[in-house]
């Protein structure tokens, strides 16, 4: 098993803190369901540091949000944040892709978009099923939450997470071809 580097542990800590604190703010769209801009953190940190970082940032960060908010820890949704973070981080495993170095192509962006969207759908369905089966939540309520959360997360991913990640890669690309003049 690979050891986590100090840099990766620090990134996970910072990402989890940002995701956890920013997760306290959102716009209500359904019962106990919000558009939370914090989801963009999972996209950015996942693309920068990979699936393990995305997974841990989602798990730890969501636990922080639920703990601070005081409504109890909803483990299905905590795990769903981890799943989303993991899916967002899969892009980092593609050969030639690097936000840090500004190296990417259209295929990489498509891959991030597809894995991100699939990850969101799988994660939210998991959270809903967990709430019904384990937490005993009413089916009708969960259907509304799952639909609302899926729409909200897709919007945040497409409007904030994906464009910010592409923007970071583009800004780093500009600096990769600088030459020192003598």
From Swiss-Prot:
Keywords: Cell membrane, Membrane, Transmembrane, Transmembrane helix
Main location: membrane
Subcellular locations according to the entry: Cell membrane
Membrane topology: Multi-pass membrane protein
GO cellular component, one term: plasma membrane
Claim: NAD is one of the keywords in the record: no
NCBIfam families, A to Z: PRK13661.1 (NF010182)
Recorded family membership: Belongs to the UPF0397 family.
Protein name per its UniProtKB record: UPF0397 protein BCE_2667
Classification lineage: Bacteria, Bacillati, Bacillota, Bacilli, Bacillales
């Amino acid at each position: 098993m690979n050891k986590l580097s100090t840099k990766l542990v620090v990134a996970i800590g910072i990402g989890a803190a940002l995701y956890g604190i920013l997760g306290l703010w959102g716009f209500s769209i359904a019962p106990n369901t919000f558009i939370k801009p914090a989801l963009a953190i999972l996209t950015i940190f996942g693309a920068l540091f990979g699936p393990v970082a995305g997974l841990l940032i989602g798990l730890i960060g969501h636990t922080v949000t639920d703990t601070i908010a005081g409504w109890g820890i909803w483990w299905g949704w905590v795990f769903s944040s981890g799943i989303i973070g993991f899916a967002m981080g899969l892009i980092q495993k593609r050969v030639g892709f690097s936000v840090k170095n500004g190296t990417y192509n259209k295929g990489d962006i498509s891959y991030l978009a597809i894995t991100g969207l699939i990850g969101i759908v799988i994660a939210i369905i998991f959270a809903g099923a967990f709430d019904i089966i384990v937490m005993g939540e009413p089916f009708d309520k969960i259907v509304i939450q799952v639909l609302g959360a899926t729409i909200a997360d897709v919007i945040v991913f497409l409007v904030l997470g994906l464009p910010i990640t592409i923007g970071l890669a583009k800004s780093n690309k500009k600096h990769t071809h600088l030459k020192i003049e003598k």
